[in-house]
């Protein structure tokens, strides 16, 4: 009888801690929504608030910029290094966003940064990963 009580107690504890762990994972995923990821990207690029940017970028993310006829490519580490150099620097631009495509697995958001004399259009692709919505690709064009 004592063994049966011990086994029952063990199963109850296992179920309790398993449910608590699942709730923690869900809460973290709710933080990584499309809106959170895009807002974090904009805050880093426009306002120099870089503290949360790494969390919303996928490890294999690619960043591509077309400047005139020149194509520049960067990975996550390189883009984070570049953004860190502009920490707390406020860009002199106005920003607008528009969702170009969205479904349960993928979202593409256009982020326009309008400066005096030119506009930088960023096409931000986000994927719904097991860790929440992550930026997987950013393609930037200067007009």
Regions found by a protein language model. Give the residues of each.
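Short, low-complexity N-terminal intrinsically disordered segments enriched in polar/charged residues
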Residues: 3-8, 19-47
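Hydrophobic alpha-helical targeting segments used for export or membrane insertion
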Residues: 9-13
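Surface-exposed, charged secondary-structure patches
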Residues: 29, 77-118
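Short, well-ordered alpha-helical segments enriched in acidic and aromatic residues
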Residues: 48-60
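Short beta-strand segments enriched in hydrophobic/aromatic residues
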Residues: 57, 113-115, 139
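A short gly/proline-enriched turn/hairpin at secondary-structure junctions
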Residues: 62-72, 86-88
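Short beta-strand edge/turn micro-motifs at domain boundaries
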Residues: 119-143
């Amino acid at each position: 009888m004592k063994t049966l009580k011990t086994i029952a107690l063990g199963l109850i504890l296992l179920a309790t801690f398993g449910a608590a762990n699942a709730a923690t994972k869900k809460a973290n995923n709710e933080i990584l929504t499309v809106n959170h990821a895009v807002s974090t990207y904009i805050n880093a690029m426009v306002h120099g608030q870089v503290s949360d940017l790494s969390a919303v970028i996928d490890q294999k993310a690619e960043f591509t910029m077309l400047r005139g006829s020149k194509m520049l490519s960067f990975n996550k580490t390189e883009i984070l290094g570049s953004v860190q150099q502009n920490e707390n620097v406020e860009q002199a631009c106005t920003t607008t966003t528009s969702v170009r495509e969205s479904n349960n697995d993928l979202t593409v958001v256009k982020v326009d940064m309008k400066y005096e004399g030119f506009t930088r259009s960023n096409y931000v692709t986000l994927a719904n990963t097991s860790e929440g919505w992550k930026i997987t690709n950013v393609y930037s064009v200067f007009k």
